[in-house]
Curated annotation (Swiss-Prot):
Record organism: Corynebacterium diphtheriae (strain ATCC 700971 / NCTC 13129 / Biotype gravis)
Pfam families listed in its UniProt record: Ribosomal_L36
Keyword annotations from UniProtKB, A to Z: Ribonucleoprotein, Ribosomal protein
GO biological process, one term: translation
Gene: rpmJ
Record protein name field: Large ribosomal subunit protein bL36
Gene Ontology CC annotation, any one: ribosome
Single Gene Ontology MF annotation: structural constituent of ribosome
Family the UniProt entry places it in: Belongs to the bacterial ribosomal protein bL36 family.
Length: 40
């Protein structure tokens, strides 16, 4: 999992979902797990 300042480019990838967990914003991607990230 990467920590990124901006998740805008990742959320446009096919299969990406933006999820909020415990006050943090995550992008999870079941199709392409390389694009997992947390905003920070």
């Amino acid at each position: 999992m990467k920590v990124r300042k901006s998740l805008r480019s990742l959320k446009n990838k096919p299969g990406a979902q933006v999820v909020r967990r415990r006050g943090k914003v995550y992008v999870i991607n079941k199709k392409d797990p390389r694009f997992k990230a947390r905003q920070g």
